[in-house]
Amino acid sequence: MYSMEQVVNLAKHRGFVFPGSEIYGGLANTWDYGPLGIELKNNVKKAWWKKFIQESPYNVGLDAAILMNPKTWIASGHVGNFNDPMIDCKKCKARHRADKLIEDALDAKGIEMVVDGLTFDQMADLMKEHEVKCPDCGSEEFTEIRQFNLMFKTFQGVTESSTNEIFLRPETAQGIFVNFKNVQRSMRKKLPFGIGQIGKSFRNEITPGNFTFRTREFEQMELEFFCKPGEDLEWFAFWRETCKNWLLSLGMTEESMRLRDHGEEELSHYSNATTDIEFKFPFGWGELWGVASRTDFDLKRHMEHSNEDFNYIDPQTNERYVPYCIEPSLGADRVTLAFLCDAYEEEQLENDSRTVLRFHPALAPYKAAILPLSKKLSEGATEVFAELAKDFMVDFDETGSIGKRYRRQDEIGTPFCITYDFDSVEDKAVTVRDRDTMEQVRMPISELKGFLEKKIQF
């Protein structure tokens, strides 16, 4: 099994991800997506939008503002309840999330336990029972566990006063809920229907870490699917299966993921069913997707605080009710990292070895690389590049031996290398090499576009 360090080193070396503000010593746990990283992440986002918005007869899109009226966050419960259990080491003063310290300590002993949902007293008892130590200095002396609100505060306007206090959104979902009526009316939607959006969110995490898995600035891909009360669990099962199948359709292996249902003690007070789709990272299991049946909690809260009526009148029965909501919430950065980890392989060949990223062609940063066999052939190869670049992200590489160029493309996950050789000038054909099998076939240049279009389908 490869390590997280190997993936991180490749990501930095090959231009997937760079440390943020690196020339100034960086800023803890901030990352910049490089040329290949942004292509990979954009492809993941496009694939999500295609499946959950474009191909769905039920769903439409939205792009709500990051900054919202602060009453939004009072209504949603974030101002009062969006907290993590914080604890400080008395010896080295390091600050930690108590629940994660306990889970890591139990995991090291081979005990699987979800601590989320326990009281502070129960957490404190577990820390004593299992002699939980500070990961920084090894001390077992901690302060009492206390609440820490995760929202970033800022001020709107020129005066820094409590009346001008606003927040960076901690999730994209609330922008959907407050626009429920706008979307429903303008798009003439009947239940069931969904609203999806992709956007940045911000959480002042106590202990971010594991590369891009847990960061304070992150991107979400969220769908809020509204339905009639009583039909919610049926739709919950539908979206849970759809989410899993989307991951499988893009090449994620069944063995690398699991579906974990929340027990009664772990469920949020407003939820009647929640499943986490988790991925087995080199550092352990981590949540990618939370699929939750949120009942009518969110719309009712906003009705109470805004006096806006979110009741829906059923056109067939004339029933009047507040819709229930199913929320599949996916972290764009997390799932991008998961696809990167799942694709990573160090392969031993007969007389050689190679590092290869086995991305599904739909996700690969470059769909193909154009490789002229000699610099004398650059003109003809450039014409092939120009034609394919109208429809696909393709690379052009004329530096080094053809073998080294193949290895470079394997390492960044390019599924097809297209070699333009001396015969290409006459027969208008090229050699296409498959990344995974390394097999090569001769193909007319005129067929390349259709070939790539077929391969990137999922």
Swiss-Prot record:
One of its GO terms (molecular function) is catalytic activity, acting on a protein. Its main location: cytoplasm. One of its GO terms (cellular component) is cytoplasm. Its EC number is 6.1.1.14. One of its GO terms (biological process) is glycyl-tRNA aminoacylation. ATP binds at residues 203-205, 213-218, 287-288, 331-334. InterPro entries: aa-tRNA-synt_IIb, aa-tRNA-synth_II, aa-tRNA-synth_II/BPL/LPL, Anticodon-bd, Anticodon-bd_dom_sf, Gly-tRNA_synthase/POLG2, Gly_tRNA_ligase_bac, GlyRS-like_core. The keyword Cytoplasm applies. It is an enzyme of class 6 (ligase). Keywords: Aminoacyl-tRNA synthetase, ATP-binding, Cytoplasm, Ligase, Nucleotide-binding, Protein biosynthesis. It catalyses: tRNA(Gly) + glycine + ATP = glycyl-tRNA(Gly) + AMP + diphosphate. It comes from the Bacteria. Gene3D superfamilies: 3.30.40.230, Anticodon-binding domain (3.40.50.800), Bira Bifunctional Protein, Domain 2 (3.30.930.10). It is found in: Cytoplasm. Pfam families: HGTP_anticodon, tRNA-synt_2b. PROSITE patterns: AA_TRNA_LIGASE_II. Substrate binds at R97, E171, F218, E219, Q220, M221, E222, E327, P328, S329, L330, G331. PANTHER family: DNA POLYMERASE SUBUNIT GAMMA-2, MITOCHONDRIAL (PTHR10745:SF8), GLYCYL-TRNA SYNTHETASE/DNA POLYMERASE SUBUNIT GAMMA-2 (PTHR10745). Belongs to the class-II aminoacyl-tRNA synthetase family. Homodimer. Catalyzes the attachment of glycine to tRNA(Gly). This is Glycine--tRNA ligase. The lineage of its organism: Bacteria, Bacillati, Bacillota, Bacilli, Bacillales. The gene is glyQS.
